[in-house]
């Protein structure tokens, strides 16, 4: 029979192992060429999982939602179970042109853009494509909604229409509204920009186009940068370093975020940076459009 001191010693040796075993395994999901890839949080162990674009790994890390391109303008939302490889393609939506799925925090619904009657609208559906509904109609400015994102409580969403930023309930009712020109003093939004709320719901992570020329000659258009928008004040501040082209942000944790960047306008990679950091760290080369599981 083991003595008490020896048993205590062995227990202390086991504690770190047990704690590590209890920690969730988080993953990165990103685009590479015409396919969607999965990797460990540090970028190692990358593997191709499916052909498609606009990857969004579910918060629980069990499934990935994405856009499956077809011929011409045909695009469908699809969901794949990562363990089995089984996938469901949403072919019964009211349009054959839908893209950019975003998971609800509880992993039960998907939000995306869908083309109806010459306008992009926001669609909401279950993870099997059932129970489809529109989120309102056009924006109050009579423009198309862009950049949909879930609020952290799953009861409302954020979007923008190139004129204003909105918080909407799931019927499309406007809960809050901010002018983009007031929120960004030296930048503007485009239809492909991403919104990422903080876990505490007090701020939004944005990418936006700077009102300035950039140093990369091979880059067409204004240089992109990452901003943190404070909901209470309605103002934003740039957090990505000067001269760094940064877009497509997502939260890694409360103090760090991931984003896509390039140094030459031709080759892309996923980088990591803290909110106050100045030197981005490469996580995955030849990658873009990153999302990360929460657990």
Short names for language-model regions:
Residues 5-17:
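Bacterial N-terminal signal peptides
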């Amino acid at each position: 029979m083991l003595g008490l001191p020896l048993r205590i010693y062995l227990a202390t040796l086991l504690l770190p192992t047990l704690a590590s075993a209890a920690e969730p395994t988080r993953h990165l999901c990103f685009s590479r060429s015409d396919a969607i890839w999965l990797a460990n949080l540090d970028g190692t162990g990358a593997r191709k999982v499916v052909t498609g674009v606009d990857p969004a790994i579910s918060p629980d890390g069990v499934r990935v939602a994405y856009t499956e391109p077809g011929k011409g303008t045909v695009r469908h939302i699809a969901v794949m179970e990562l363990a089995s490889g089984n996938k469901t393609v949403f072919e019964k939506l009211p349009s054959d042109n839908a893209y950019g799925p975003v998971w609800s925090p509880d992993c039960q619904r998907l939000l995306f853009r869908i083309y109806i009657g010459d306008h992009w609208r926001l669609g909401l559906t279950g993870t099997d494509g059932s129970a489809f509904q529109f989120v309102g109609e056009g924006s109050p400015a009579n423009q198309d909604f862009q950049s949909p994102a879930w609020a952290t409580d799953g009861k409302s969403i954020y979007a923008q229409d190139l004129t204003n930023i909105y918080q909407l309930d799931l019927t499309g009712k406007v809960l809050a509204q901010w002018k983009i020109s007031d929120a960004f003093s030296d930048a503007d939004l485009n239809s492909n920009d991403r919104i990422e709320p903080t876990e505490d719901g007090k701020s939004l992570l944005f990418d936006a186009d700077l009102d300035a020329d950039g140093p990369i000659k091979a880059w067409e258009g204004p240089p992109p940068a990452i901003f943190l928008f404070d909901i209470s004040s309605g103002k934003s501040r740039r957090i990505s370093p000067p001269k760094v082209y940064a877009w497509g942000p997502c939260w890694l944790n409360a103090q760090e975020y991931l984003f896509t960047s390039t140094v030459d306008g031709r080759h892309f990679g996923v980088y990591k940076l803290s909110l106050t950091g100045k030197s981005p760290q490469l996580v995955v080369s030849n990658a873009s459009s990153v999302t990360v599981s929460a657990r």
